[in-house]
């Protein structure tokens, strides 16, 4: 009888409470101010980046943020990746854990070994309330009213997302038996709803307050979606981010999915964000943001192109596009993003590199040592016409910490390494000889290397990156010479001898008009013809607008938003000189000459092998340090890109049908 009276009171509260309206407005307003990532609503491409996956998952994952979180549904498998927020929480430190009995030690949540050690129980009483996510405000009102009734018992209610609807759960029990004992009382409170005991699920995750261990929500991802968390934004100028315990800071949405396969059970974490946000999180971890702006622009375009080319690489296995490591591109989020990074990415927004209308695979490495290598010689297989070997005489590799190196190895040490670490068990005695059988065509990279032991047994290594990885404990690239006791090598040094003026061609990429009233130029700069000269206005924060959707001299007024200042109206003689195609502007660059010295390096023992090498990495495509050297000489990003990739074009990714690769 008591339970039925409580149920009636609760129903009246649900129907008549003013708090319902207030909470509804709160949830709606929070959702409205939260940054969303709808591909259809902006010009950005949303991508998925794996942060924790496969055997790297843990049973729980903690994050913090300043203003709390927005909670939503994040699809990872529908090809759209539209984040739909439906709730918010004010806590600024949360944990997402596998749905199971949990214990906590030193702030880390993990599976409890026994019921005696349970801190957060995995069994609950579930009510089939079946609210839609659009009715989350009503679900929240019911939850709060239910909490008021349960307060004396020490239990509380929380929502669970399950197959597209929101249900309510009560309690945190360590066993089914303890849940069953509490069931009659709890089920009787809302007897007008079907209820049941909910056991831990291998498709669910639990959202916890990190400090108290209180369950905030549970999420069952069996419908192919994931629990999405994004940092709640504020009206301040500072962006809101999510931070991990290792102090990496992330933009966009963090998507959590239960991963339970092949004896591994934990929480997979995927960062869903725009392509440009991703590029911002790659650039300062691959190169320094203090490098010249033209280098940053060139790298932004190369990184964006590589991401577009490899999009979906891990989809079939893990349901994300790219990993966050060197296998794809080194991505660590927004922690190092500064004004230079933002300007470089924004001024090249959407630009990618293509070859004959298809996205180019824009490989890059730290430095090449004065020569790149064709992609077919790196890993084998067919070569790409735009990834061929080039001399790069402008590269100051000898001035870089890892650009020029010397390594000495004893014959016995090398034998043990090759046998134990690399599996060359056919080698029986100390290494007596190392022979370079073949260099990659038009390159100084070693393509085929032979090791011969004291008994005449030999082992061959083919392809430049296999050569590099085989000796990876010692060498930084396959661009080397080797000798026993000593070796002769060449060393190049760049010397500036003067300056010259060149024509720098800058492409103008015109996007489709918006509402038939504006046109945006996506390029490094907008060139404005003033009364005195042709000047460049940065497109880092520029929109080019006209009344007709076209840009032409002497017609409708042209509005230019410079990086700083008010919107400026230009007309007549003060109009953009060319709306599309290429224009030629004078650019002063430094002239240089290369001085080559021939030297000899000697080992400490006449029996030891000595390697002298240049460059760091696989050597295909663009050299990061080489791109810096070209910018230091005065060249722009287009020249840099064309110096490393043959016969390519720079276009907006939206001009490529279905990201044709």
Label each PLM-derived region with a short phrase.
Residues 3-661:
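Conserved, single-site charged/polar hotspot
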């Amino acid at each position: 009888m008591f339970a039925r009276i409580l149920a009636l009171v609760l129903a009246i509260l649900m129907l008549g409470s003013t708090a319902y309206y207030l909470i509804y407005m709160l949830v709606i307003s929070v959702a409205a101010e939260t940054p969303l990532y709808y591909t259809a609503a902006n010009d950005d491409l949303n991508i998925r980046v794996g942060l924790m996956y496969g055997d790297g998952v843990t049973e729980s994952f903690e994050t913090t943020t300043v203003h709390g979180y927005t909670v939503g549904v994040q699809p990872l498998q529908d090809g759209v990746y539209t984040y739909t927020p439906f709730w918010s929480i004010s806590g600024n430190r949360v944990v997402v854990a596998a749905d199971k009995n949990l214990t906590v030690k030193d702030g880390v949540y993990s599976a409890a070994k026994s019921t005696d050690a349970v801190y957060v129980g995995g069994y609950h009483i579930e009510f089939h309330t079946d609210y839609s996510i659009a009715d989350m405000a009503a679900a929240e009102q019911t939850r709060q009213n239910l909490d008021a009734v349960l307060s004396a018992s020490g239990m509380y209610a929380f929502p669970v997302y399950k197959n597209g609807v929101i249900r309510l759960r009560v309690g945190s029990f360590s066993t089914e038996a303890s849940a069953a004992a509490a069931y009659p009382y709890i089920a009787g409170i809302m007897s007008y709803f079907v209820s049941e005991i909910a056991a831990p699920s291998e498709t669910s995750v639990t959202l916890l307050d990190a400090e108290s261990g209180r369950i905030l929500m549970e999420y069952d991802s069996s419908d192919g979606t994931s629990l999405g968390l994004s940092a709640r934004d504020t009206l301040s100028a500072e962006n809101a981010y999510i931070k991990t315990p290792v102090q990496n800071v992330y933009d966009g949405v963090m998507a959590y999915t239960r991963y339970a396969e092949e004896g591994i059970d934990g929480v997979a974490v995927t960062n869903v964000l725009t392509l440009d946000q991703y590029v911002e999180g790659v650039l300062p971890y691959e190169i320094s943001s203090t490098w010249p702006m033209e280098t940053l622009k060139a790298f932004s375009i190369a990184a964006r192109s590589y991401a577009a080319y490899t999009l979906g690489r891990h989809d079939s296995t893990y349901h994300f596009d790219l990993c966050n490591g060197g296998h794809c591109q080194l991505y660590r989020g927004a922690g190092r993003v500064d004004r230079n990074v933002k300007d470089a990415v924004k001024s090249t927004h959407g630009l990618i590199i293509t070859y004959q209308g298809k996205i180019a695979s824009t490989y890059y490495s730290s430095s090449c040592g004065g020569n790149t290598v064709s992609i077919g010689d790196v890993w084998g297989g067919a070569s790409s016409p735009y990834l061929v070997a080039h001399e790069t005489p402008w590269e100051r590799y000898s001035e870089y910490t890892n650009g020029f190196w010397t390594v000495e190895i004893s014959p016995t040490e090398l034998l043990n390494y090759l046998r134990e670490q690399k599996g060359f068990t056919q080698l029986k005695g100390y290494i007596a000889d190392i022979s370079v059988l073949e260099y990659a065509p038009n390159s100084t990279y070693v393509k085929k290397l032979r090791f011969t032991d004291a008994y005449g047994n030999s082992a061959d290594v083919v392809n430049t990156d296999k050569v590099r990885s085989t000796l990876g404990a010692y060498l930084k690239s396959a661009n080397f010479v080797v000798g026993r006791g000593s070796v002769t090598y060449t060393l190049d040094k760049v010397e500036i001898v003067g300056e010259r003026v060149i024509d720098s061609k800058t492409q103008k990429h015109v996007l489709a008009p918006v509402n038939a009233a504006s046109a945006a130029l996506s390029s490094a700069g907008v060139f404005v013809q003033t009364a005195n000269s042709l000047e460049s206005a940065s497109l880092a924060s520029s929109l080019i607008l006209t009344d007709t959707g076209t840009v032409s001299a002497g017609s409708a007024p042209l509005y230019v938003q410079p990086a700083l200042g008010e919107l400026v109206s230009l007309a007549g003689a003060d109009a953009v000189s060319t709306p599309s195609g290429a224009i030629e502007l004078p650019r002063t660059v430094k002239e240089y000459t290369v001085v080559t010295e021939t030297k000899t390096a000697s080992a400490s023992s006449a029996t030891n092998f000595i390697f002298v090498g240049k460059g760091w990495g696989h050597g295909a495509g663009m050299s990061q340090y080489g791109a810096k050297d070209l910018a230091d000489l005065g060249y722009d990003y287009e020249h840099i890109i064309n110096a490393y990739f043959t016969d390519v074009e720079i276009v907006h990714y939206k001009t490529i049908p279905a990201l044709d690769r």
